[in-house]
Amino acid sequence: MEMSALEAAYKNPIASLFVVYGRRRVGKTTLLAEFCKGKHALYYLATEESIQANCAAFREMAADFLQDELLRSAANAGWEMIFKTLLAQPSEEKLVIIIDEFQYLGKADKAFPSVFQKIWDTQLKNENVEVILCGSLVHMMMEQTLSYSSPLYGRRTGQIKLKQIPYAYYNQFFPAMSEQERILYYAVTGGVPKYIELFHQGKEIYDDILQNVFTPQSFLYEEPEFLLRHEVNDIGSYFSIIRSVAAGNCRVSDIAVSLSIPVTSLPKSLKTLCDLDILEREVPPTEKNVETSKKGQYRIRDNFIAFWFRFVYPMRSFIESGHAEIAMNKLRSGFIPNHVGYVYEDICRSKMWELNAQGKLPFLFDRVGRWWGGKDTEIDIVAVDTNDRSNILFGECKFHQNTQMQLSELRQLKAKAAAVQWGKESRTEYFILFCISGYSEELHRLAESDPHIILG
């Protein structure tokens, strides 16, 4: 989909300005390298050096690209002159210009987005060119290119926020594994290409975790710190918030109490963590106004971050003192119930959207998610059509490794459904069940005879 968007812009005869952004390791550079194949493309990777050093490096890159020794020797040539020279080169092909890690230029010189805006307005926008600004510091990229206050606001013709690879594609990376095994790997790697590459060795999951995460010298041991340190200034306070959420404090008030800080100090930090796709705010799908609902809860959205804060961060003293086996024992006892089970619920909710689009469910819904309320009642899946209160679908997800789902679990789901008041007067209730180990014969017979029961 992302490649199609870039290709469509390339084939369009008018100029385009694309913003591509997303957290580190998700494959932005690989995407752009693939896109550039066979094209008249200039790729420049910005650095954290001064704006003058970057300009000189960009001039060298452009001189190599054009084979222009005059440009190379023009030590005083600024950004505008370099772009003017690039555009003056005759070519039947569309010119592609990519500036990767664009945010470093704005960090080195706060005026650079304004400089680039002028270059776009006076030179680029009327030429046969596709410009792609790419960056991995999400918050900074949003400020410099997408926010209303940015000089580039309104100039972009498209944007791509590159995210992790969905679970549905994991069979391409681990084709020899069973679905149960693939889910275990997804629960740790979370769709990040670099992490998948590290774990793609065909070992047993716990051996892979020990080698790649539970060893102080391993690539992923300090990964969350590395990711956050580049995005925020006060990494300690952000770590505390994530740790609190990982411990089960999901409401803003609970997070504040656990950290002994005022509630009013949290909204900005929570928004930043949501912008980074580390946290997300959940609201029961039956709520009338999602944005203003007081039932909002926060959860860790990133599988690896959730895994790390549950199993690595609390055990670092053991790991660093040479007793990783203690941390591994804790992992073995808690990995499935305290982590994989929740990841499996996410997978099932994603599958709900696929089934919905394919017309394989009793009605078309526009909201699906986890529901909570009543006296500590929680339902894994509730799906509704907000414009029609006559139907509602309830779902249960179980990652039983060796046990089939039983009729008793359907009965429990039906009992919990009674706590949901949405459309209760005249609604038709449907129930969908997901279980990684399958279903009992009783459930199969019931699903065959009752159209209100669906086995996912």
What are these regions (language model features)?
Residues 1-329:
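Phosphate-binding site recognition
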